[in-house]
């Protein structure tokens, strides 16, 4: 269960760690596209006629009511669920199954409970065949980037829900994916921790070069995180909107942003 505040190590400031660690070289973000695609299962079609182009390196947020097909869309982009009709491509080539180039991050942290945070982050590095010393160094660097430098030897149950999600993000990015697919990863967190994770996500992901598709039911989260926001409803992709920038929590009365928020809520029937 998530806790409402982050666990602190005595006498140390967790927040300074990301700035002290040099970022790894960025990857080349991938282009993901759906072409007139029907998504779901033969006995339960979730979305029909989806045309969507996710540009390399962008953050696309996907918002819609519960049961509208958001998770189905994400699993299709991950290669876990083939389209029922139409096509799906990665960089113009057919996408035919799961790949280490596309990392999934879920609401439940999915960390292995018997492994320390560092050992969890080392998993994709071990799959890549890196030597033990290199795995340890890279895992510690990623944990530092997400503010967990003081918690590398902790087991998942000894840290807060927000910290477990930070570790899950570090594990996903340690594998150097070209796309990160996120299924409501902050949905179980309290409001303060959630806002901190959103800020951290933008900061860390912008340094990776990866393409991001982020599913949420929260319109404000979608507008804060996304370069564009895709709207789902009534079994289809209803619209894709550009999000005005700069990204700033302090700006509440920007006319373009206010109009977009109103448009999104109207489109979703809220």
Tell me what each language-model feature is.
Residues 154-157, 175:
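Conserved signature/switch motifs of ABC ATPase nucleotide-binding domains
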Residues 86-98, 138:
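Conserved ABC transporter NBD signature motif
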Residues 78:
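Helix-to-loop junction immediately C-terminal to a conserved catalytic motif
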Residues 169:
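Hydrophobic anchor residue at the start of the ABC signature
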Residues 63-65:
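The feature captures the beta-strand-to-loop junction immediately N-terminal to the Walker
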Residues 126, 133-151, 203:
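Conserved ABC ATPase "signature" region
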Residues 115-123:
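Short coil-to-helix segment of the ABC ATPase nucleotide-binding domain corresponding to the Q-loop/switch region
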Residues 180-183:
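Catalytic Walker B motif of ABC-type/P-loop ATPase nucleotide-binding domains
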């Amino acid at each position: 269960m998530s806790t409402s505040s982050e666990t602190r190590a005595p006498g140390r400031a967790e927040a300074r760690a990301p700035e002290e660690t040099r970022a790894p070289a960025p990857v080349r973000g991938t282009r993901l596209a759906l072409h007139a695609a029907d998504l779901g299962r033969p006995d339960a079609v979730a979305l029909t006629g989806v045309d969507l182009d996710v540009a390399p390196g962008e953050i696309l947020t996907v918002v819609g009511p519960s049961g509208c097909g958001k998770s189905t869309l994400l699993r299709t982009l991950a290669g876990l669920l083939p389209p029922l009709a139409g096509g799906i491509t990665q960089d113009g080539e057919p996408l035919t199954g799961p790949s280490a180039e596309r990392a999934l991050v879920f609401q439940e942290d999915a960390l292995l409970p018997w492994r320390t945070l560092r050992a969890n982050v080392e998993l994709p590095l071990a799959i890549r065949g890196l030597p033990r010393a290199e795995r340890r160094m890279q895992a510690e660097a990623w944990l530092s980037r997400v503010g967990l430098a003081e918690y590398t030897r902790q087991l998942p149950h000894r840290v807060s829900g927000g910290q477990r999600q930070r570790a899950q993000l570090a594990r996903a990015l340690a594998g150097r994916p070209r796309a990160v697919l996120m299924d409501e990863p902050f949905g179980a967190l309290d409001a303060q921790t959630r806002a901190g994770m959103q800020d951290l996500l933008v900061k860390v992901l912008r340094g990776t070069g990866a393409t991001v598709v982020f599913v949420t039911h929260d319109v404000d989260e979608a507008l804060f995180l996304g370069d564009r926001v895709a709207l789902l409803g009534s079994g289809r992709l209803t619209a894709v909107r550009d999000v005005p920038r700069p990204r700033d929590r302090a700006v509440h009365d920007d006319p373009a942003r206010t109009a977009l928020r109103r448009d999104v809520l109207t489109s979703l029937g809220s």
